[in-house]
Design a protein with these regions (language model features):
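N-terminal mitochondrial targeting presequence
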Residues: 1-67
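N-terminal Rossmann-like dinucleotide/flavin-binding domain of flavoprotein oxidoreductases
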Residues: 143-245, 341-359
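FAD-site-proximal beta/loop scaffold in flavoenzymes
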Residues: 271-294, 377, 383-465
Length: 631
């Protein structure tokens, strides 16, 4: 816990929400202990939520017999079995099954055909049906099997992939050297230095959908490349796009979210689409990796989590692979993570992203796109243009609720997502988890969350309830992000820059106190500094209390002066409290790790704190994390 003298060295900031309209033209995580180009990356820390451990290694194969007659007999039996399997068509499965072999060799092309090849091969009735093949579904079927060991679970996914984790797609996978990427393109190093695949389980964990109903011990089958068109809730049936009906006992909708597009690209020609990527899936990652040739110019459109993470990751990718890429990041906010972070911290973050080699263009929007001379020309709203080789659109996502209209399910008009009750039920025997669920939070009101931790926890709880547990969803989910070597943060609750914030940052060298007559301070809309804040501490340090420039000024000179003042600050480590009705509803832990449980308790108390400076002591701002060397 911080001593009183240490606390006065902290820099306290109070921010009010900005209210001005946005003007035109004016991103698992980094790898702790991994040295890249002489710099140590500290970031991905122990995840707060329960994690599913990777599967245990299979037992060693039995020793070979040296008896020649037995070997000859075995060869004959094997040949006969292979011949029978060929006649039965068991070798007609989708080639995607071989793409993540134990050797990690990348397949040249992935088949887009469904598996099994025909919907006639799918079970006509299953006890548990999960629609969607992402993290929420994975957590759900693990929970179901945990409570019903012989459960028979069918997962229907519209992707040609087994369930996999998405966070590494914008982070760790880009840090692999060329030779490793060629052999093991979908493996990454975790925060603890251990390497693993993005796939949650190896393929032999799953059972063939055609064998599911006959399996004496049950199992989980993944039907890939199929789409559910409608749910008959009354009769408990899922109807596929080709009319195939599958009856279920319990059903989960884990349809996730899909990436948003921009009008300029939606209205563009088909040729433009060849030069753009709506980044979301492993297929997007692989295609983008192939398109990033040496010397390419890449525009990333979007300043939120995905856009900022990709910008930093691609810059590091360029350095590791010696690609000499030019990375541009364009967004309409005034700084990176502008919808999440207080404005002063957003400005500071933008400067750190630029230090990573990214050319950041804030307050910029694209109004048109066209292909010229095999290049993509982006016309901006101020009529200037940017010519690049490829554009990545990362402007957020929207819940996939297509089933709502065809199945008469309720969607929240403001937040989107299927409306569910406390047990994550949308209707009887029909549950929703992950990005597509709009649930009620007793402390924060109705919410919809698009983060990995929420997908894991909501999927697990939905699976338990499908197995008969009837538990309410009370978890306050967290999320994390890493932007280069200097920024790694965890957050929980309502984290929105439109809310008032109070931040406490640790300062190694105490800043000079800015008197309340300072022109710069006035330009920043500073509050009067209380005497207690300017009085010397026992260590001779002082603290400054500022009100960040949340309201956009009418004149650019004032805004520039405020920004210049902010640039002199160093926000390396701190805690930001987000307030609503003077109660803490969200917390960002800025380069502070393994304290998310404390933040969760503060939000759960749902009370007014007279002195958030005292609350900040709970996070031990001056503790130093232990450094561990990479293997």
């Amino acid at each position: 816990m911080l001593s009183a003298s240490r606390l006065t060295i902290a820099n306290l900031r109070i921010a009010q929400p900005r209210v001005a309209a946005i003007r035109t033209r004016k991103h698992c995580a980094a790898l702790p202990g991994l040295s890249l180009s002489g710099r140590r990356w500290f970031s991905r820390k122990a995840h707060d939520s329960a994690k599913v451990a990777p599967p245990a290694c299979p037992p060693p194969p039995p020793s070979e017999k040296s008896n020649t007659p037995y070997i000859i007999g075995a060869i004959a039996l094997t040949a006969g079995g292979l011949g029978l399997a060929y006649k039965l068509g068991l070798f007609d499965s989708d080639p995607v099954l071989e793409q993540s072999s134990s050797l990690g060799i990348k397949a040249s092309k992935k088949s887009k055909s469904p598996f099994p090849p025909s919907s006639k091969d799918l079970p006509k009735e299953v006890p548990y049906l999960l629609i969607g093949g992402g993290t929420a579904s994975f957590a759900a079927f693990r929970a179901i099997k945990g409570h019903d060991a012989k459960a028979k679970v069918l997962v229907i996914s519209n992707e040609p992939e087994m369930p996999y984790m998405r966070p590494p797609l914008s982070k760790e996978l880009w840090f692999n050297p060329e030779e490793k990427a060629q052999l093991e393109p979908l493996k990454f190093r975790q925060w603890n230095g251990v390497e693993r695949s993005i796939y949650y389980e190896p393929e032999d964990f799953y059972i063939d959908p055609r064998q599911l109903l006959d399996a004496p011990n049950g199992g989980v089958a993944i039907a890939r490349g199929y789409e559910v068109q409608r749910i008959d809730v009354v009769n408990r049936k899922a109807i596929l796009t080709d009319g195939t009906e599958i009856s279920y006992g319990e059903c989960l909708l884990a349809t996730g979210a899909r990436p948003k597009n921009l009008p300029a690209f939606e209205a563009a020609s088909l040729a433009v689409k060849e030069y753009t990527t709506l980044f979301k899936s492993v297929n997007d990652f692989e295609e983008l990796s192939e398109k990033l040739k040496a010397g390419s110019k890449v525009a990333i459109i979007g300043g939120g989590f995905l856009g900022s993470e990709l910008a930093c990751a691609l810059s590091k990718f360029s350095e590791i692979r010696e690609k000499n890429l030019e990375i541009y990041q364009l967004f309409h906010e005034e700084g990176n993570m502008g919808k999440v972070l207080p404005e002063y911290l957003s400005y500071w973050t933008t400067d750190r992203v630029r230090e990573e080699g990214v050319k950041v263009w804030p307050k910029t929007q694209v109004k048109a796109a066209e292909v010229q001379d095999k290049k993509l020309r982006l016309t901006l709203t101020d009529d200037s243009s940017l010519v690049v080789d490829h554009a990545i659109i990362a402007v957020g996502s929207e819940p996939n609720t297509d089933l709502a209209k065809t199945s008469n399910l309720e969607v929240d008009p403001k937040l989107g997502g299927f409306v569910v009750d406390a047990e994550l039920r949308a209707r009887s025997h029909l549950y929703v988890a992950g990005d597509a669920a709009c649930f009620y939070d007793p402390k924060l009101g109705r919410r919809r969350v698009e983060h990995h931790d929420h997908a894991v926890v909501s999927g697990r709880l939905a699976g338990e309830n499908m197995a008969g547990k009837n538990k309410p969803y009370t978890h306050q989910s967290m999320f994390w992000s890493d932007l280069g070597p200097r920024i790694g943060y965890e957050a929980i609750g309502l984290v929105d820059s439109s809310l008032p914030t109070v931040a406490v940052f640790a300062k190694v060298d105490p800043p000079e106190v800015i008197p309340d007559t300072s022109e710069k301070l006035q330009a920043a809309n500073a509050t009067v500094i209380p005497a207690s804040a300017t009085a010397p501490s026992s260590a001779g340090a002082k603290a400054s209390v500022l009100n960040h420039p949340g309201i956009v000024k009418a004149e650019e000179k004032l805004a520039a002066a405020a920004k210049k003042e902010e640039e002199n600050d160093d926000f390396n480590k701190g805690v930001i409290f987000y307030l609503r009705d003077e109660k803490v509803v969200g917390v960002v832990l800025w380069n502070i790790f393994n304290r998310i449980g404390t933040a969760r308790k503060i939000i759960a108390q749902h009370t007014h704190y007279d002195d958030l400076n005292e609350v900040a002591k709970l996070f031990n701002l001056h503790d130093r994390p232990e450094e561990t060397e990479a293997e």
